[in-house]
Curated annotation (Swiss-Prot):
Residues 1-33 are annotated as: Disordered. Belongs to the nitrobindin family. Residues 1-10 have a biased composition (Polar residues). Pfam families: THAP4_heme-bd. This is Ferric nitrobindin-like protein. It comes from Corynebacterium efficiens (strain DSM 44549 / YS-314 / AJ 12310 / JCM 11189 / NBRC 100395). A motif (GXWXGXG) lies at residues 85-91. The lineage of its organism: Bacteria, Bacillati, Actinomycetota, Actinomycetes, Mycobacteriales.
Length: 232
């Protein structure tokens, strides 16, 4: 197993353009609090009644991706509250091993009342006409945040990578993370360097995110997507 480490250096919260067509998060037009609430209420007409499937006989609280259903969100997670839900959409990738391609993605941020968020991402490749080609990448992990608004994200990739990210909220609708440790198994992707991620809600209340990786000593966008809420 190999390990790459990077220090937390902060950096520009903006997302540069790239072959991955990164959505612009920090440069998005501002949205007022009232407009955000009204837009969320309108979207909730189609998503508020839905939740992720669960089993009924578990003796402890089930995971929920809907703040209206299931256990109450832990008070320590209020800075991450807007992320909770199921998000689905499309994005662009530009990777050393796969080249440039389009993909579909679903991200689930859920909780069980404890002081962490569960994270799951599934990615599938798309052809030039938007049709599904097949599964591509998968991640699972946990987000935590302390009283100083310091975020910890432990992320495991199905390809044989485990990463630890640290970060902080940029504002109430955006979160920036930087990898402190990237560990790759003997059969994992040797081209995956340390990186940085940015997640944020766009003025449309869609979730945009970008993953940047160190390539030739320069951070370059690897994957990015724009996702709409389907649950929560």
């Amino acid at each position: 197993m190999s390990e790459n480490e990077t220090s937390k250096t902060g950096g520009n919260a903006g997302v540069p353009g790239s072959g991955a067509d990164a959505p612009s998060l920090s440069d998005s037009p501002a949205i007022s609090g009232n407009d955000a609430v009204n837009l969320a209420a309108e979207q909730a007409k189609n998503t508020a009644h839905r939740n992720i499937p669960t089993l009924d006989d578990l003796p402890i609280p089930e995971d929920t991706a809907n703040l209206r259903l299931g256990p109450n969100l832990h008070d320590g997670l209020l800075a991450l509250l807007p992320l909770v839900g199921v998000w689905r959409g499309e994005g662009q990738a530009d990777t050393p091993e796969g080249g440039q391609y389009s993909f579909g993605q679903q991200i689930i941020f859920s909780h069980d009342g404890e002081n962490y968020l569960s994270f799951e991402s599934r990615v599938w490749r798309l052809d030039s006409e938007g049709g599904t080609v097949g599964p591509d990448q998968r991640e699972t992990g946990f987000w935590r945040i302390n009283l100083q608004d310091e975020i910890e994200f432990v992320c495991a990739h199905a390809s044989g990578v485990v990463e630890i990210y640290y970060g902080q909220p940029i504002n109430e609708r955006a979160w920036e993370l930087e990898s402190a440790s990237t560990m790759v198994t003997a059969t994992g992707p040797v081209t995956l360097g340390p990186g940085k991620r940015l997640y944020g809600l766009l003025p449309t209340n869609e979730l945009g995110w970008v993953d940047e990786r160190l390539v030739d000593k320069e951070l370059k966008p690897r994957m990015s997507a724009q996702l709409h809420r389907i649950i929560g």
